[in-house]
């Protein structure tokens, strides 16, 4: 105590020295506000809920401008143009006052009616509203959320923030490109549109400017032209249903022709092709019963052997060059000549021997001709069945129908 009294009685304790000591002391550090990232997420979610009506209004405007429902978009465009062109200045002021007073009146009535509701009804409205529940969950989420859930909420917010900033940066970069004339075409269009709007505002009344702007927004986008093209195609289909049927049939025929070309063998055909595939195609191309019977009587489809005399090309050239013969007549002539050759080469009697086992043909042992090589065999030696498509037939039925061949031809065709 003595020492303290002595110190106080010294020259340092003079009243004139006290302010100097106080002024020399450093100020106490103020406590800085801590940054809480989860509070930022909470505020963002609340703001998102409060701004939802504006988001819904924007979605409705985009829905109309994209012509998702063409009738509503057309009626909206026409209605706005009529309003812009018919309302005068007084009507516009009246409409503005109405747009301000109606929401105010609705909010006031809602608040007045809410005060008269019982407590149970207020609680029911509070806890059965989806958005109120979401807001309540957001407010209480910090207390009940675990650490992983909180981290997930923060990550979701950061992802949305990054996407928003990326869009904003892209918009700013696009604006700078236009202002710095990096793309002369876009910049000239932008400045030309601005000059055109200034001229329109100077030359035309405001109502006409608004009507032109509204028509440009509705009728100048790509969705409007898409809807017009769809309706035009639908109208053409209704006006010409036969054309559509013909187009479907032609597409089906083209598809069948493409499959036939894929199934056909690449081997070149001679001037007059007597292969089994060509004979079957001729039968399918000409459904005349007379020529079908002529082919079915023989039950044979043969190839030209090496020592056989080929058909002279003059007949084929004559048939092709003669303009008075139709395609059906050409096919009839080819089938008739083929049938006659088969009848001359393979008689209908059962005399002779089997080329495989040398057995004599009789009433009990019928002769059978190989559909590939054309030689005569007994029923035992010519009992192998192969599909007609393996011999070059390109018809769709050739994949299912089978013909009888000998053992050697079966080995050759099976490879």
UniProtKB/Swiss-Prot annotation:
Q: Which GO terms describe its biological process?
A: endoplasmic reticulum tubular network formation; neuron projection development; neurotrophin TRK receptor signaling pathway; positive regulation of axon extension; protein localization to plasma membrane; vesicle-mediated transport
Record region (Necessary for interaction with KIF5A) = 275-365
What the entry lists under InterPro entries is as follows: Protrudin, Znf_FYVE, Znf_FYVE-rel, Znf_FYVE_PHD, Znf_RING/FYVE/PHD
Q: What are the start and end residues of every segment in region (Disordered)? A: 1-24, 254-290
Q: In which tissues is it expressed?
A: Astrocytes express both isoform 1 and isoform 2 and oligodendrocytes express only isoform 2 (at protein level). Isoform 1 is expressed specifically in the central nervous system and selectively in neuronal cells. Isoform 2 is expressed in cerebrum, cerebellum, spinal cord, heart, thymus, spleen, intestine and lung.
- Give residues annotated as binding Zn(2+) 2: 370, 373, 406, 409
CDD domains, per database record: FYVE_protrudin (cd15723)
Q: Note the zinc finger regions (FYVE-type) by start and end residue.
A: 348-414
Q: Which ranges sit in the Cytoplasmic compartment?
A: 1-66, 110-192, 214-415
Q: Which residues lie within the membrane without crossing it?
A: 193-213
Q: Where are the transmembrane segments?
A: 67-87, 89-109
Q: Which gene encodes it?
A: Zfyve27
Q: What is this protein called?
A: Protrudin
Matching entries from Pfam families are given as: FYVE (PF01363)
Acidic residues bias: where? Answer: 280-290
């Amino acid at each position: 105590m003595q020492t303290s009294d002595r110190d106080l009685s010294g020259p340092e304790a003079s009243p004139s020295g006290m302010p100097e000591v106080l002024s020399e002391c450093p100020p106490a550090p103020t406590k800085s506000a801590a940054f809480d990232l989860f509070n930022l997420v909470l505020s963002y979610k609340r703001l998102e809920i409060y701004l939802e009506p504006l988001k819904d209004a924007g979605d409705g405007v985009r829905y109309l401008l994209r012509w998702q429902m063409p009738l509503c978009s057309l009626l909206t465009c026409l209605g706005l143009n009529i309003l812009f062109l018919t309302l005068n200045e007084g009507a516009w002021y009246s409409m503005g006052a109405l747009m301000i007073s109606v929401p105010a009146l609705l909010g006031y009535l809602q608040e007045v009616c809410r005060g008269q509701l019982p407590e149970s009804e207020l609680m029911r409205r509070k806890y059965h509203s989806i958005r109120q529940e979401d807001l309540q969950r957001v407010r209480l989420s910090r207390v009940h959320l675990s650490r992983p859930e909180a981290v997930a909420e923060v990550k979701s917010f950061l992802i949305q923030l990054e996407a928003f900033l990326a869009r904003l940066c892209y918009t700013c970069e696009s604006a700078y490109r236009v202002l710095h004339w990096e793309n002369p075409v876009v910049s000239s269009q932008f400045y030309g549109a601005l000059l055109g709007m200034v001229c329109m505002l100077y030359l035309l009344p405001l109502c006409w400017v608004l009507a032109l702007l509204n028509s440009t927004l509705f009728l100048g986008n790509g969705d409007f032209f898409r809807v017009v093209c769809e309706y035009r195609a639908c109208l053409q289909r209704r006006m010409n249903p036969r054309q559509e049927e013909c187009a479907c049939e032609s597409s089906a025929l083209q598809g069948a022709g493409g499959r036939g070309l894929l199934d056909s063998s690449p081997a070149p055909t001679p001037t007059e092709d007597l292969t089994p595939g060509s004979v079957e195609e001729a039968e399918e191309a000409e459904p005349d019963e007379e020529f079908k019977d002529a082919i079915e009587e023989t039950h044979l489809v043969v190839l030209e052997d090496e020592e056989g005399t080929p058909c002279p090309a003059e007949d084929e050239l004559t048939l092709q060059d003669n303009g008075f013969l139709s395609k059906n007549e050409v096919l009839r002539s080819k089938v008739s000549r083929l049938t006659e050759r088969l009848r001359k080469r393979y008689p209908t009697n059962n005399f002779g021997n089997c080329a495989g086992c040398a057995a004599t043909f009789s009433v009990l042992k019928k002769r059978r001709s190989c559909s590939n090589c054309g030689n005569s065999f007994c029923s035992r030696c010519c009992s192998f069945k192969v599909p007609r498509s393996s011999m070059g037939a390109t018809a769709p039925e050739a994949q299912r129908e089978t013909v009888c061949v000998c053992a050697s031809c079966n080995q050759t065709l099976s490879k």
